[in-house]
A protein has these predicted regions:
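ATP-dependent adenylation/nucleotidyltransferase module used to activate substrates
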Residues: 1-145
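Acidic/polar active-site rim loop that often engages polyanionic ligands
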Residues: 144-154
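Conserved small/polar residues in nucleotide/adenosyl-binding loops
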Residues: 156-158
Length: 158
């Protein structure tokens, strides 16, 4: 395997654990990245400890101001204008995945992954978000707006 490093969006939850196991079984060296969106020190500590228990490097990046501006303010504004906001979709396409890609680039890591349940299919030279194999856990709706350059970096979909 030529480039076997991957940066994993890592909350420390069960899906993050599953992603680590799947990636390692496929021969990848995993580095975990936890994004600090709300200043939840208990969540950050849990992620750090769990990454340590798995024996993988752990990094954290604060995106609090960006999250407040791009997700919380958007949600509030949309709600008060009588619109139906989609904060999770917006967070994934504007914060989580772009930050994961930028951090991977800064570290010289070519691949990114998360524990989200979805698949990527290719057609006509492009990659598309499609439903997960398990419809009960499918999260493709929250990821529909991921740009092509992010999909091109993405390795794994549970």
């Amino acid at each position: 395997m030529k480039d076997n490093r991957v940066l994993l969006g890592f909350s420390g939850g069960i899906d993050s654990f599953a992603a680590v196991g799947l990636l390692q079984a496929a021969g990848y060296h995993v580095t975990a990245l936890t994004l600090d969106m709300r200043g939840d020190s208990a969540l950050l500590e849990k992620a750090r400890l769990r990454a340590g228990a798995l024996g993988i490097p752990w990094r954290m990046r604060s995106v609090r101001e960006r999250f407040e501006r791009e997700v919380v303010d958007y949600f509030t504004d949309s709600y008060f204008r009588g619109c139906t906001p989609a904060p999770c979709t917006r967070c994934n396409s504007r914060i989580k995945w772009p930050c994961l890609a930028a951090e991977a680039d800064a570290l010289g890591i070519r691949h990114i992954a998360t524990g989200h349940y979805f698949r990527i299919t290719s057609a006509g030279g492009k990659r598309y978000v499609t439903r997960a194999a398990d419809n009960r856990k499918d999260q493709s709706y929250y990821l529909w707006d991921l740009p092509q350059e992010i999909l091109d970096l993405s390795l794994i979909h549970i």
